[in-house]
Regions:
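Glycine-rich phosphate-binding loops of nucleotide-dependent enzymes
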Residues: 1-239
């Protein structure tokens, strides 16, 4: 198993956002974690990366426990996060943001990988000298994904990548996620856009108020009556 959480409890101050969460991400898969705002999804991502700390339970990556491991060391292990809200460096150029994604690398593929990002996102190439803060929301999301991919992750964490984006841009972002997966990167996707997430995922977890309330193959979860009513507007997710 590439990533495994067992009975993880975590939160902030007096707030417990994860109440005994267990989930697994097999290598080569796309796994999605869906749920309403405030369910604890982002806390789960931060806990995996070491930004948040688990008070109970274990997080392991490739069989290695991550307790006490610093965030930069988690990145070295092969996990990258595209955070909620993009969080690009607005006073740095597009190219500088991408270079920062590769800051722990020391190989001769960095320039080629940057060109690959520019091929995937032509608008970023056109704006490579522009500051991140001048980009549109969609372009900033492209940059956030490109920055994460520059780290050559084995596991890519995406936290609400479609948030606040126009439908056409959302489709482009999900197409890119699938392309990255096809190239060999495992994906854990947190999304409120359950329909899009369930369309591309292999396996799905549904999170409510800090607990996993449902899990299964994504196609089966998409047909669950409760999921359809709560997240899909009463309709099945089309493939």
């Amino acid at each position: 198993m590439l990533l495994e959480l067992k009975d993880v409890v975590a939160g902030y101050g007096d707030i417990t956002a994860m109440k005994g969460i267990s989930l697994s991400v097999p290598e080569g898969s796309i796994v999605t974690l869906i749920g309403a705002n405030g369910a604890g999804k982002s806390t789960t991502m931060k806990t995996i990366l070491g930004i948040g700390k688990a008070s109970k339970g274990t997080v392991s990556f490739q069989g290695k426990g991550l307790k006490g491991v610093k965030s930069y060391q988690v990145v070295q292990e092969g996990i990258s996060l595209v955070p909620e809200g993009r969080q690009i460096l607005q006073n740095m150029t597009v190219q500088e943001n991408l270079e920062l994604g590769a800051y722990q690398r020391n190989d001769d593929r960095i320039a080629a990988d940057m060109e690959k990002v520019f091929t995937r996102f032509p608008r970023l190439k056109e704006r490579r000298r522009q500051y991140g803060g001048t980009l549109s929301g969609g372009e900033q999301q492209m940059l956030a994904i490109g920055r994460a991919v520059m780290a050559q992750p084995k596991l890519l964490l995406l936290d609400e990548p479609s948030m606040g984006l126009a439908p056409l841009v959302v489709q482009q972002i999900f197409d890119v996620i699938q392309d990255i997966h096809k190239e060999g990167t495992t994906v854990l996707l947190v999304e409120q856009n359950a329909q899009k997430a369930l369309q591309i995922a292999d396996y799905a977890y549904v999170m409510e108020t800090g607990k996993i309330v449902l899990e299964g193959p994504a196609a089966e979860v998409a047909q669950n009556p409760q999921v359809m009513a709560a997240y899909l507007g009463g309709h099945k997710a089309s493939s």
